[in-house]
Curated annotation (Swiss-Prot):
The gene coding this protein: rpsI
PROSITE patterns cross-referenced by the UniProt entry: RIBOSOMAL_S9 (PS00360)
Name of protein: Small ribosomal subunit protein uS9
Keyword Ribosomal protein: yes
Organism, scientific name: Marinomonas sp. (strain MWYL1)
GO biological process, one term: translation
Disordered: annotated span: 107-130
Length: 130
């Protein structure tokens, strides 16, 4: 008899996270590794825990996450977005507090593509008048 689980998909930059919340004791498992093993940076761990700490649910749920693509920062943001969506599925009244903290909105900023004739997306080659 499995407990009810809540699901949320989070995205940030090129990362996608699938988040499953189950009633439990506060375990966070990312790609079959603990959060401390997966993220070396403390800032990334803080970002992941933010929505759970905001609604005082750190000890209520076991969180199982699979995340793909992108780098450390993008993956942490995607996980935060996924946890937020799963929490809203669990209790819709949390939406207001999560929105006021800015976790509900998907951060749509992506890397701008490099253009032909330029060195980077916008950086032009040095101009010489003579």
């Amino acid at each position: 008899m499995s407990a009810t689980q809540y699901y949320g998909t989070g995205r940030r930059k090129t990362s996608t996270a699938r988040v499953f919340l189950k009633a439990g004791s506060g375990n966070l498992v990312i790609n079959n590794r603990s959060i401390d093993q997966y993220f070396g940076r403390e800032t990334a761990r803080m970002v992941v825990r933010q929505p759970l700490e905001l609604v005082d649910a750190t000890e209520k749920f076991d969180v199982y996450i699979t995340v793909k693509g992108g780098g450390i920062s993008g993956q942490a943001g995607a996980i935060r977005h996924g946890i937020t969506r799963a929490l809203m599925q669990y209790d819709e009244t949390l939406r207001r507090t999560l929105r006021s903290a800015g976790f509900v909105t998907r951060d749509s900023r992506e890397v701008e593509r490099k253009k032909v004739g330029l060195r980077k997306a916008r950086r032009r080659p040095q101009f010489s008048k003579r």
